[in-house]
């Protein structure tokens, strides 16, 4: 029987707590190359459920899945210099096959914008072919200097969508639509509240005209970018000659977007909802929604029969696991808590005798005795209540830790206090943001959509009057 290791309290050392819960929650093993991960069933199951639910959303929008190659020739990449320049430090490059040097370097995809240009060019001839919108589920390679499971890794999994449109208005509208879709998805399935906004020029995606983001607050007060959408304008289509004939038979370049979310969301789940007992997985993406734990079922044919009956009732409407091992009920409960199963059912001798079970919520640890006849109804209601509570707790924490500051000395203090700070800023230069980051460790997360006030305020740095507010925070 594997011993359950002690988890460092998150208040004591958040980074160590994160490492402990990732390890003890049976989420990963480390791969043989720095920054690579082996996704265990408990983490890959989360990703599978994210895929399942998001694919339903894509299908409802009429968006189809495709898969493009992992390998990109250097000649194709170089056509969009600004794009390759932004990724240059992270590009993994193949130069040899066996002992033979390649005639051209091959890149392992850091993202797929350039590959989609070749695809779109073959797909689009007329305005009647537009819009073209595709999604792919893929792995990408970015040679990160500093790695952290799920948050920054050499290889990670993601969803990336790409679209081509007839007009700038249509493409811009779709960029915002997908950001709202991500926001709703995180709220509905991951129980994570976010702040929507536009990235500053310094923080936008290389090659994009503008980038939009969802910023989530982790329990240590740091921000985590949890989904982005990019309005690419004609930056890529002009470089790769992706054009169409308009209604007047004139050549035009398409307007494009790209948008993605990744396995970084697993890290967001851990750091938004986890506690000192382990991880807490939101019910609608949990690989196992209900753990059925019995007191030594193999020692009693009657209890084993009762456990089988409970499993049969629950396994159709829910994702269920039954622990039939001879481990103690206390050990099983602790293991279930560490692994973040939203709801567990404990079955002891008295429960069996009364034809009932004990339901235990992972989020509050509240216990409830339920008749086997009501178990489906109560389990469904309880799982929804768990999701709602996780979201409300995260929403309250976000609201209570956002402050508006106009004075730079106060700004530095609040950043040191692990707050999200919203401040007026007219200084749009990268140098101003670099200076703030150097002094405080905070970066400009976004220009929030919902926090732009009428009238003008003094800029945090130069004191000129501005209408623009920017969200700053330390971030992963």
From Swiss-Prot:
CDD domains: ProRS_core_arch_euk. Gene3D superfamilies: Anticodon-binding domain, Bira Bifunctional Protein, Domain 2, C-terminal domain of ProRS. InterPro entries: aa-tRNA-synt_IIb, aa-tRNA-synth_II, aa-tRNA-synth_II/BPL/LPL, Anticodon-bd, Anticodon-bd_dom_sf, Pro-tRNA-ligase_IIa, Pro-tRNA-ligase_IIa_arc-type, Pro-tRNA_ligase_II_C. This is Proline--tRNA ligase. It is found in: Cytoplasm. Its EC number is 6.1.1.15. Homodimer. GO terms for molecular function: ATP binding; proline-tRNA ligase activity. It comes from Mycoplasmopsis pulmonis (strain UAB CTIP) (Mycoplasma pulmonis). It is an enzyme of class 6 (ligase).
């Amino acid at each position: 029987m594997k011993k359950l290791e002690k988890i460092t309290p998150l208040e004591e050392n958040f980074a160590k707590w994160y490492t402990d819960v990732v390890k003890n929650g049976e989420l990963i093993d480390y791969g043989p190359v720095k920054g690579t991960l082996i996704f265990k069933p408990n983490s890959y199951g989360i990703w599978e459920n994210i895929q399942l639910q998001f694919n339903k959303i894509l299908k409802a929008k009429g968006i189809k899945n495709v898969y493009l190659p992992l390998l990109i020739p250097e000649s194709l990449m170089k056509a969009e210099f600004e794009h390759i320049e932004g990724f240059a430090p992270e590009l993994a490059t193949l130069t040899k096959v066996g002992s033979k040097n390649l005639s051209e370097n091959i890149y392992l995809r850091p993202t797929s914008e350039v590959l989609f240009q070749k695809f779109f060019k073959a797909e689009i001839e007329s305005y009647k072919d537009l819009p073209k919108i595709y999604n792919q589920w893929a792995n990408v390679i970015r040679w990160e200097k500093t790695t952290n499971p799920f948050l920054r890794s050499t290889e990670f999994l993601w969803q990336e969508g790409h679209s081509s449109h007839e007009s700038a208005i249509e493409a811009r509208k779709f960029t915002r639509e997908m950001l709202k879709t991500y926001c709703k998805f995180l709220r509905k399935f991951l129980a994570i509240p976010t702040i929507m906004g536009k990235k500053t020029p310094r923080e936008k995606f290389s090659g994009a005209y503008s980038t939009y983001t969802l910023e989530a607050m982790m329990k240590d007060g740091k921000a985590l970018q949890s989904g982005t959408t990019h309005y690419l304008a004609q930056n890529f289509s002009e470089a790769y000659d992706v054009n169409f004939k308009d209604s007047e038979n004139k050549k035009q370049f398409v307007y494009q977007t790209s948008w993605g979310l990744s396995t970084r969301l697993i890290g967001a789940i851990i750091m938004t909802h986890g506690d000192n007992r382990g991880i807490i997985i939101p019910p609608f993406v949990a690989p196992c929604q209900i753990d059925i734990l019995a007191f030594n079922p193999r020692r009693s044919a009657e209890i084993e029969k009762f456990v089988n009956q409970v499993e049969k009732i629950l396994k159709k409407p829910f994702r269920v696991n039954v622990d039939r091992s001879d481990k103690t009920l206390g050990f099983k409960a602790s293991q279930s808590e560490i692994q973040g199963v939203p709801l567990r059912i404990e079955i002891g001798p008295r429960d069996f005798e009364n034809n009932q079970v004990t339901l235990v919520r992972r989020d509050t640890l509240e216990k409830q005795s339920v008749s086997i006849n009501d178990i489906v109804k109560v389990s469904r209601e309880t799982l929804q209540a768990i999701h709602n509570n996780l979201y409300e707790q995260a929403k309250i924490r976000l609201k209570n830790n956002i402050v508006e500051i106009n004075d730079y000395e106060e700004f530095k203090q609040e950043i040191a206090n692990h707050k999200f700070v919203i401040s007026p800023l007219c200084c749009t230069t990268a140098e101003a943001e670099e200076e703030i980051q150097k002094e405080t460790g905070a970066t400009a997360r976004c220009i929030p959509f919902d926090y732009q006030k009428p009238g003008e305020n003094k800029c945090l740095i130069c004191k000129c009057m501005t209408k623009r507010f920017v969200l700053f925070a330390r971030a992963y």
